[in-house]
Amino acid sequence: MSEVLSPMTAISTKPAPRVGFVSLGCPKALTDSELILTQLSAEGYQTSKTFEGADLVIVNTCGFIDDAVKESLDTIGEALAENGRVIVTGCLGAKGGEGAGNLVRQMHPSVLAVTGPHATQEVMDAVHLNLPKPHDPFVDLVPNAFGIAGIKLTPKHYAYLKISEGCNHRCTFCIIPSMRGDLVSRPIGDVLNEARALFEGGVKELLVISQDTSAYGVDVKYRTGFWDGKPVKTRMLELVQALGDIAEPYGAWVRLHYVYPYPSVDEVLPLMATGKVLPYLDVPLQHSHPDVLKRMKRPASGEKNLERIARWREICPEIVIRSTFIAGFPGETEAEFAHLLEFMREARIDRAGCFAYSAVEGATANDIPGMLPLEVREERRARFMAVAEEVSSLKLQQRVGATMQVLVDSAPALGRKGGTGRSYADAPEIDGVVKLLPPEKISKTLKVGEFTRARIVGTQGHDLVAIPV
């Protein structure tokens, strides 16, 4: 009697090809990595965070400042040494080298392929060429199991939502437009579909990112799109309103990043005042003195920004403002720097970061006369941060005694030993945290990714200390 084999028996059990993956750089690069990983997984590739045992490695790079370039080149070198088969993508991939060459190719000529940022299809083409995708007659018939939201590299309870790519500004210290191009806004229907999918998947905090969130829709002249059968204008105000509406049934947060201080931002403040989205704005001001801002080719001026911030606080007294600044920009005088320190005290910026100016290859700021010695740039950065910490400390002290909603990020032993979380004033990774003490009630537990109420009892540096209630 002959043996009859089932179809499953006849199919090869050859393991799926494995791709090692490293993601470097900012949240915008992270979302590019998520798109690539989602596509790899949808096509049947296995992925890992290590080079060992991988059939090839993809390195998503950063090329904005010298330290980031070095880290990216070093990582590519490590991947080549440990694995030998490397595909490079990201901002460094778009960076030119000597002559008309490519920097990555010049430094690491043995890489398999090099692409710029936001190039999922080009990366997949390179993967297919060097590691043909697996064929499974059963899996090939299954739709993408990851849905619209795809694979996320963040913790499950928060996610980045990129609304556009590129930038129309030509700031003299920045080379992003040369790597990521001019502004290209995503269709508003696609953005809102992804947001809803993320909330449905359990995300409790959505962080809206881009190179210039305020300019969303400028490139398409605020074209009217459609979502859920309704017309929606491709513009920041309508986007934020819709995101708040989608988040509300889930009790989730929406946080805005990379918001240029245009007058149109004023229209969004009432949505913050009414709780539609978090009263938090990440606004990259960079400096306050009009002459420095002119050399930077930045919009607005310190005085206009002071007026705008005051107006924002009138509309929404609870607003928290985060910003980044550059100390020691070429030609910056002591008087111009003193102007920046005074601006910080007057504006009362809640959260501030500062970089000592560093020349970026390809930036037009390199041609501005008056490059300051490194020790002067670093000394000014330290002085700026001392003032920023002074302002931040006063702001944090004002919260002692208040009860705040906190999103739990860590909770060992269900929080019985305490944990950490963040209030609406704290974006992940760049701001402080709320250090949660053990709950007073034995029955009280904490769970990562859930909200809890906590009474603020003190401060520690940039952080708050609280007891869950």
From Swiss-Prot:
It is found in: Cytoplasm. Catalyzes the methylthiolation of an aspartic acid residue of ribosomal protein uS12. Binds 2 [4Fe-4S] clusters. One cluster is coordinated with 3 cysteines and an exchangeable S-adenosyl-L-methionine. Its EC number is 2.8.4.4. It holds the Pfam family UPF0004. GO terms for biological process: tRNA modification. [4Fe-4S] cluster 2 binds at residues 167, 171, 174. Residues 153-395 form the Radical SAM core domain. The keyword Hydrolase does not apply. Residues 17-132 form the MTTase N-terminal domain. Residues 397-469 form the TRAM domain. Belongs to the methylthiotransferase family. RimO subfamily. The keyword Iron applies. [4Fe-4S] cluster 1 binds at residues 26, 62, 91. GO terms for cellular component: cytosol. It is an enzyme of class 2 (transferase). One of its GO terms (molecular function) is protein methylthiotransferase activity. Transmembrane segments: none annotated. This is Ribosomal protein uS12 methylthiotransferase RimO. SMART domains: Elp3. Its cofactor is [4Fe-4S] cluster. Keywords: 4Fe-4S, Cytoplasm, Iron, Iron-sulfur, Metal-binding, S-adenosyl-L-methionine, Transferase. It catalyses: L-aspartate(89)-[ribosomal protein uS12]-hydrogen + (sulfur carrier)-SH + AH2 + 2 S-adenosyl-L-methionine = 3-methylsulfanyl-L-aspartate(89)-[ribosomal protein uS12]-hydrogen + (sulfur carrier)-H + 5'-deoxyadenosine + L-methionine + A + S-adenosyl-L-homocysteine + 2 H(+). Its main location: cytoplasm.
